[in-house]
Amino acid sequence: MQLLKSCHYHVCMKVFIQENSWLAKLAAAKLKADQAAIVFGSTIHLHNTSRAAFLANKEWLCHELKHVEQYQQHGFAVFLVKYLLEWVKKGYYNNRFEIEARQNESNISLLKRVSIM
């Protein structure tokens, strides 16, 4: 993941947003949800929500930014494997990475560590 030199005195991650993503559409179908966001690396893929609506929903945004941070901490391939194994063992809701993301939904400090492209 590419890092910027600084972002409001913090190390800053570049985060991309992809609207109308087929990946997010698949996630929505699997979760039986009308809307979905799914993260791959530093890109947040959206289904049935606009970039503006997603960015306005700070809890949802912080949840997905935590996943971006998890990718950064573990590395792309390692995180993806760990996440999928956790999902197979415990399902979506009890997946430790989802629990951590839910616990960070009000962590607005995540917003200071990213630059949304």
Show the residue positions of the predicted features.
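Active-site recognition of the HExxH zinc-binding catalytic motif
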Residues: E59-Y71, A101
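Short pre-active-site segment immediately N-terminal to the catalytic Zn-binding motif
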Residues: I44-L61
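Metalloprotease/metallohydrolase-associated module, dominated by Zn2+-dependent proteases
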Residues: L3-N48, H74-M117
